[in-house]
Amino acid sequence: HMDGFGVEPDLIVGDFDSYSYPEYDTETIVLPCEKDDTDTVFAVKEALRRGFEDFLLIGVVGERLDHTLGNVSILLMLDSEGKVGTIIDDYSEMEIVSDRCGKPCIIDDSYVYFSLINISGTVRGVTIRGAKYPLEAAEITCEYQYGVSNEVLPGCTAEVSVGEGKLLLIKVR
């Protein structure tokens, strides 16, 4: 992924059980194959320790649903730390919308769809404006996910805000 973006890493972290050892002259932390944290969680914790604020996670959504869900939960961890995290895959972008944001999340009409998924308890005060399916101060629970597959109105931007709790925002290109 790094080569495709023309990025040279400052730090490489992993156990290299599924990839060969990197051929970069870069600081590398080699992890044991058997450990409590995944490579990605360890890397994010190390970046937090080093003072990073914004996190772009690429290549963390794939064939293994367990790893994908674990990586999505990293976004919750980052939000709890007051940091910003985004996951990007071939089709979508994911981020957390929470009461910590302090302002509405803006979604432009370049996205085909967007969904709000509750992945952590009851979320209250959910407001969606500028979308095909608006909401005003609604409640979304894990059991009732009615924020799936919404659309930004043509020529508009949608705004999403949360009064209490956290939602996963998935913007589909």
List PLM regions with ranges.
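Short beta-strand segments
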Residues: 58-60, 88, 117-118
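Short, acidic/small-residue loops that bind anionic groups at enzyme active sites
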Residues: 77-94
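Long, charged alpha-helical interface segments
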Residues: 92, 97-173
